Amino acid sequence: MKKAGLLFLVMIVIAVVAAGIGYWKLTGEESDTLRKIVLEECLPNQQQNQNPSPCAEVKPNAGYVVLKDLNGPLQYLLMPTYRINGTESPLLTDPSTPNFFWLAWQARDFMSKKYGQPVPDRAVSLAINSRTGRTQNHFHIHISCIRPDVREQLDNNLANISSRWLPLPGGLRGHEYLARRVTESELVQRSPFIMLAEEVPEAREHMGSYGLAMVRQSDNSFVLLATQRNLLTLNRASAEEIQDHQCEILR
């Protein structure tokens, strides 16, 4: 019993330390790198010179930019042209806020252009990390390849994913996930952030603790994936864990 209690105490200490490290990362100057690129470089260059550089695309009227990430050959980031920190922002559950997940899905074409040939939709994934699972304090959705093992697991669970948020059998990457099937028409009309906040009990009050991902299924529907921070299981809710920025799935 004493050993079990000691082990539990050690796990708590590790979890607290991990959370502290995550917080320390977010309070450093480097955590504003993406925001500075968007607000001080991409946006002014587009407005003054009609040149989105260093971004790949700047859409001021639509409220977003697309930037090639340095990590991986095909990874891009979709970010707002104004200040939104991350999943904890109440702006994301405001219907007047742009539907960033839908916009990010449209931006997957940048992967194909970079690759030199079409990247199949089944190979693409979108992900945003929770407040403790990210290293940057500017909202950004990762547009990148999906891990082959995650792709296989989602294919195998196609029949088990419904239009309600339910636990995904077996979870993903050792962490628990909720999964919800959505049609393209649903996705166009409603942001996944609003779906999560309105449909999962108590999610609205804890949006910053969630990471969210989206993948297309073989029946042309989409699956939304949500994981919530759980420091006791060392889950920082970094939904980016389902992605493979080296794109092995294309080889």
From Swiss-Prot:
Database matches in InterPro entries:
CDP-diacylglyc_Pase, CDP-diacylglyc_Pase_proteobac, HIT-like_sf
Q: What is its EC number?
A: 3.6.1.26
Reactions the enzyme catalyzes: a CDP-1,2-diacyl-sn-glycerol + H2O = a 1,2-diacyl-sn-glycero-3-phosphate + CMP + 2 H(+)
Its UniProt pathway annotation is: Phospholipid metabolism; CDP-diacylglycerol degradation; phosphatidate from CDP-diacylglycerol: step 1/1
Biological process (GO) annotations held by this record are: CDP-diacylglycerol catabolic process; phospholipid biosynthetic process
| Chief place of localization | membrane
Q: Specify the domain of life of the species encoding this protein.
A: Bacteria
The answer, when asked if Phosphoprotein is one of the entry's keywords, is: no
GO CC terms in record: plasma membrane
Residue stretches spanning the membrane: 4-24
Keyword entries, A-Z: Cell inner membrane, Cell membrane, Hydrolase, Lipid biosynthesis, Lipid metabolism, Membrane, Phospholipid biosynthesis, Phospholipid metabolism, Transmembrane, Transmembrane helix
The record gives the membrane topology as: Single-pass membrane protein
Q: Name one GO molecular function term.
A: CDP-diacylglycerol diphosphatase activity
- Could you tell me where this protein is found in the cell? Cell inner membrane
The UniProt similarity line reads: Belongs to the Cdh family.
Query: Known HAMAP family for this protein?
Result: Cdh (MF_00319)
Q: What is this protein's record name?
A: CDP-diacylglycerol pyrophosphatase
Origin species, per record, is: Escherichia coli (strain ATCC 8739 / DSM 1576 / NBRC 3972 / NCIMB 8545 / WDCM 00012 / Crooks)
